[in-house]
Amino acid sequence: MPSLMVGGTTSSAGKSLLAAAFCRILARRGYDVAPFKAQNMSLNSFVTSKGKEIAIAQAYQAFAAGIEPDERMNPVLLKPKGNFVSQLVVMGEAVGDVDSRKYYGVKVEWLKRVVEEAYLSLAEEYDFVVIEGAGGMAEINLYERDLPNIHIARFARPDILIVGDIDRGGVFASLYGTYALLPDDVKPLVKGFVINRLRGREDVLESGIRELERLTGIRVLGVLPYLDYNFPSEDSLNIEEWGAEGTVGIVRLPRVSNFTDFEPLREHARFLSLNSSLNGCEVVIIPGSKDTIADLKALKSSKLGEEIVRKAGEIPVIGICGGYQIMCRELVDMGVEHGRIRAKGLGLLDAVTEFREYRKRTVQVEKRVNGNAVILDRIRGEKVWGYEIHKGITRASNPIFEDDGCASEDGMCWGTYLHGLFWNENVLRALGGYLGIKFRQKEDWADLIADEVEGRLDLGVLGL
């Protein structure tokens, strides 16, 4: 069973996007293909139909391949919590918090077996597995415990592409250095380099490409332009790449989580700092939070929070998960996160959220739009899918789905626990209709990136 690995010189070099493109290309050529990333560190997760958590990137690579995401595609997920601590998710199930300084010494041998079994299971079921590496491949201090790069390369023996980001500068040194530092048993697997995110003329790279090929004996398969096709990001780094304009304003909470909920809106959205204003915004969204009560306090004491409350009723205010909780009348913590406290919410919704036990609800759901919520009223009676990852229970009047959400009397303020809401094509159409604009659909970006990669890379070197 053939496999292809997309490794990189750094984090955010374009590995996730390129892996998704190969999933789409192979699927369009008739292969049954699955994505795989042995270990991912991501603030943003996706819940499968079985209620298993995986990194958001692997979920959308699966969609690009035309298949349902499952936990084998990302057997090890680390969700950073701060101070060297991450939540460890193994085969879709949270198994506890780990300190990174102890993680590599205690857990790695067990996790190697988990990774190998997950990969073999996919390899038996699919014609092709597209493997994504993590960070830079040449982390020489981690080679013996580098699950997503060196370990899986040695185990699966895939053809490897190394992608470098020219937009950051130093791409030739990065590609050469990464290849030069690879272990001797991994170097023969490298079949090509890819230069990503070129904003200028390709011909100015020709002499550098020739010299890189001479020094390494490895072909540069092609150069990709700067592609901005709403591929979900794994961490907050990519928020900085969003524009400063847009009619959809997304509140940048200090502890924001699952901001990939809003990637489909990216062309017409911007993040709002707490000291900014709503000028130019026709819709405001309060996103999820890793610490709802702390972010509530920060928002309430800010200029932006005051303006949101003041303008509620004039423009739609939407809350997703933690943002929904923030919009409630009251939040009650029974000792789960901050001790026993009661906090007044923004008061935009007639609802109360209670945190009674440290239990997180993780499930994928499909719901029918029933309530009177601006924008969603355009698709009343239709179904939407999403996933819930939250602590706390909200008691509300005027729900917008059968058993979830709440809307204000005029429908201008509403909230829901559904992550992934804006990845629904009908919701995107409804929002676009309200704003008088058109958003790019999920299927569009998958084909667009596949077309770019097919048209610009010499895939014959890979036998494709």
Curated annotation (Swiss-Prot):
GO terms for biological process: cobalamin biosynthetic process. PROSITE patterns: GATASE_COBBQ. It holds the Pfam family CbiA. One of its GO terms (molecular function) is ABC-type vitamin B12 transporter activity. The keyword Methyltransferase does not apply. It comes from the Archaea. The active site is at C321 (nucleophile), H419. The keyword DNA-binding does not apply. Residues 245-427 form the GATase cobBQ-type domain. InterPro entries: Class_I_gatase-like (IPR029062), CobQ/CobB/MinD/ParA_Nub-bd_dom (IPR002586), CobQ_GATase1 (IPR033949), CobQ_N (IPR047045), CobQ_synth (IPR004459), GATase_3 (IPR011698), P-loop_NTPase (IPR027417). Pathway: Cofactor biosynthesis; adenosylcobalamin biosynthesis. Catalyzes amidations at positions B, D, E, and G on adenosylcobyrinic A,C-diamide. NH(2) groups are provided by glutamine, and one molecule of ATP is hydrogenolyzed for each amidation. This is Probable cobyric acid synthase. It comes from Archaeoglobus fulgidus (strain ATCC 49558 / DSM 4304 / JCM 9628 / NBRC 100126 / VC-16). The gene is cobQ.
